[in-house]
From Swiss-Prot:
Amino acid composition bias (Low complexity), ranges on this chain: 108-122, 618-628
Gene encoding the protein: Tbr1
In-chain residues carrying the UniProt-annotated modification Phosphoserine: S410, S594, S640
Pfam families reported for this sequence: T-box, T-box_assoc
Compositional bias annotation for Polar residues: 58-68, 462-472
Protein name (Swiss-Prot/TrEMBL): T-box brain protein 1
This protein's GO CC annotations: nucleus
InterPro entries: p53-like_TF_DNA-bd_sf, T-box_assoc, T-box_DNA-bd, T-box_sf, TF_T-box, TF_T-box_CS
Broad class of where this protein is predominantly found: nucleus
Length: 681
């Protein structure tokens, strides 16, 4: 008999619905069909002896005392079991099907009964977000705010989204379908049941693509910058959707509503409420996706990204009104995704059932700010946002941490469909560990005090996305592999202190460089790619040229990491002219490189632009024209004020120990040439 219940629960439900209160004809049944639905509606006026409870116990074959072991039988739990027998039964289903994940989705139920009009429709899977219910927000009235539940009731689409709707649509929640258990690893997946009476195919299932990244920010309370001109969100909203009618047309848009009625402030290292929110703000709160309207096949074919959505605090913003969402600082907001089926002519008809679907992901909540308050959020933005160049210019002067490890990307955490450089730099072992020493601040050398963002001090170049410039980004839908030129095992970037002593070391490094072309690396023609993808110069030399790591962003660059070469002969000439020591030892340099390239022996002693010390294929940028920057980098590395002088026996290139004053003067000249070819990017 129990097997019959499991195989055909809809048949049993149709027989038992007569015993359920008539005002909730489909609510309990819809939750029962979704066996793994963790968000259960609290229906206080269900009959205490509802046969649904008996059905669920028969399906799970559990006794009345076989509840969650972690519930501790608190008074709230007892009250919950008395108030909602449907919840009690389905929670056992969660325990049977999902095992250890069940305790994450215990419903926080108030110990006092609430009416059906004010009871929260569902819950957030985060204990800190449980709270009293508030009047729900309507899209037509921005003055209302959102209650603590994923689907908004009493709104413009109440007849379609409420649990007590005559159509009987189930509440959109966080079910974890069995077929997605391994590929998505428990990501939020909204689903409408197709077995519900009256439903037809075309009900959406939505997946938040970059949920791991959102959760990282959510742990520290996400903050979003708002400006007068408008600022894009990071992380941005990105969804995958399925279950639509491929031939029907849909509008997909996002609106941003108040998540609670409080005004917030950052005090004592945490966000605390301070007063009531201002609910009289007028302005656009809706952002329509640029592809709307479009067919269901189009929406399901690709990721739906809202990366161009901008947040502003300009209440009178009339231009670009379609891209601007007007918010208030120090208020907490909740984005929502709406999928609306439209007619052939593109007009919306919300009066028909099933045409509007709304999805809310609580981990996308954020507090609007004009400046970041939490340094943890700032560091997360630096680590994951490849376009946060303003932070990298000023972060080490604004905040206390100056050592280099505050600017490193986080390895092995590249989320899906989010352009982050984290996995690009996931190197093995000591190559990462020895890069950024604690005395980096002592070795810093800035071109000027208080350098701000600008073309002359663009420090965001090394933080681009591996080999790819932003214009060369591949399909963001898959996790990004490592994108280094060479593998950690064959890495020749960590030169020894005497790397320039013998031709053998240079020949080995030249062979490594030549192997790039054989691998078909597209970003190696540096003249075409510019300097937007500088993976070779990102990490400092771990062991060579002294005990300290060289400054990463100043002119005294290490020749061992081969920074981005100048893309024109004019830039090379400027760099050569800025260093008077380059011409003095040009003859010696050409003579020492002769075993590598016989053509360099008859080169002009004073003209390094003609010294071809390596044979390069046609696919690589010619070193004859502008490769004097390599020797220039070696010389500038030697005269860096932060370096320890190398003994005469270990470096044949060394001629003398320069005075500190001369070092500063020459480095200042070198910086101008070094940043000259970055100004165009």
């Amino acid at each position: 008999m129990q097997l019959e219940h499991c195989l055909s629960p809809s048949i049993m439900l149709s027989k038992k619905f007569l015993n359920v209160s008539s005002s909730y004809p489909h609510s309990g049944g819809s939750e029962l069909v979704l066996h793994d639905h963790p968000i259960i509606s609290t229906t206080d006026n269900l009959e205490r002896s509802s046969p649904l409870k008996k059905i669920t116990r028969g399906m799970t074959n559990q006794s009345d005392t076989d509840n969650f072991p972690d519930s501790k039988d608190s008074p709230g739990d007892v009250q919950r079991s008395k108030l909602s027998p449907v919840l009690d039964g389905v929670s056992e289903l969660r325990h049977s099907f999902d095992g250890s994940a069940a305790d994450r989705y215990l419903l926080s139920q108030s110990s006092q009964p609430q009416s059906a009009a004010t009871a929260p429709s569902a819950m957030f899977p985060y204990p800190s977000q449980h709270g009293p219910a508030h009047p729900a927000f309507s899209i037509g009235s921005p003055s209302r705010y959102m209650a603590h539940h994923p689907v908004i009731t009493n709104g413009a689409y109440n007849s379609l989204l409420s649990n007590s709707s005559p159509q009987g649509y189930p509440t959109a929640g966080y079910p974890y379908p069995q077929q997605y258990g391994h590929s998505y690893q428990g990501a939020p997946f909204y689903q409408f049941s197709s077995t519900q009476p009256g439903l037809v195919p075309g009900k959406a299932q939505v997946y938040l693509c970059n949920r791991p990244l959102w959760l990282k920010f959510h742990r520290h309370q996400t903050e979003m910058i708002i400006t007068k001109q408008g600022r894009r969100m990071f992380p941005f909203l990105s969804f995958n959707i399925s279950g639509l009618d491929p031939t029907a047309h849909y509008n997909i848009f996002v609106d941003v509503i108040l998540a609670d009625p409080n005004h917030w402030r950052f005090q004592g290292g945490k966000w605390v409420p301070c007063g009531k929110a201002d609910t009289n703000v007028q302005g656009n709160r809706v952002y329509m996706h640029p592809d709307s309207p479009n067919t269901g096949a189009h929406w399901m074919r690709q990721e739906i990204s809202f990366g161009k959505l901008k947040l502003t605090n300009n209440k009178g913003a009339s231009n670009n009104n379609g891209q601007m969402v007007v918010l208030q600082s120090l208020h907490k907001y909740q984005p929502r995704l709406h999928v609306v089926e439209v007619n052939e002519d593109g007009t919306e008809d919300t009066s028909q059932p099933g045409r509007v679907q709304t999805f809310t992901f609580p981990e996308t909540q954020f507090i609007a700010v004009t400046a970041y308050q939490n340094t943890d959020i700032t560091q997360l933005k630096i680590d994951h946002n490849p376009f946060a160049k303003g932070f990298r210019d000023n972060y080490d002067t604004i905040y206390t941490g100056c050592d280099m490890d505050r600017l490193t990307p986080s390895p092995n955490d590249s989320p899906r469909s989010q352009i982050v450089p984290g996995a690009r730099y996931a190197m093995a072992g000591s190559f990462l560990q020895d890069q950024f020493v604690s005395n980096y601040a002592k070795a810093r050398f800035h071109p000027g005090a208080g350098a701000g963002p600008g073309p002359g001090t663009d420090r965001s170049v090394p933080h681009t996305n591996g080999l790819l410039s932003p214009q060369q980004a591949e399909d963001p839908g898959a996790p990004s592999p490592q994108r280094w030129f060479v593998t950690p095992a064959n890495n020749r970037l960590d030169f020894a202190a005497s790397a320039y002593d013998t031709a053998t070391d240079f020949a080995g490094n030249a062979a490594t460089l030549l192997s790039y072309a054989a691998a078909g690396v597209k970003a190696l023609p540096l003249q075409a790619a510019g300097c937007t993808g500088r993976p070779l110069g990102y990490y400092a030399d771990p062991s060579g040229w002294g005990a300290r790591s060289p400054p990463q962003y100043c002119g005294a660059k290490s020749g061992s990491v081969l920074p981005c070469w100048p893309n024109s002969a004019a830039a090379a000439a400027r760099m050569a002219g800025a260093n008077p020591y380059l011409g003095e030892e040009a003859e010696g340099l050409a003579a020492e490189r002769s075993p590598l390239a016989p053509a360099a022996e008859d080169a002009k002693p004073k003209d390094l632009s003609d010294s071809s010390w390596i044979e390069t294929p046609s696919s690589i940028k010619s070193i004859d024209s502008s490769d004097s920057g390599i020797y220039e980098q070696a010389k500038r590395r030697r005269i860096s004020p932060a370096d320890t002088p190398v003994s005469e026996s270990s470096s044949p290139l060394k001629s003398e120990v320069l005075a500190q004053r001369d070092c500063e003067k020459n480095c200042a000249k070198d910086i101008g040439g070094y940043y000259g070819f970055y100004s165009h990017s």
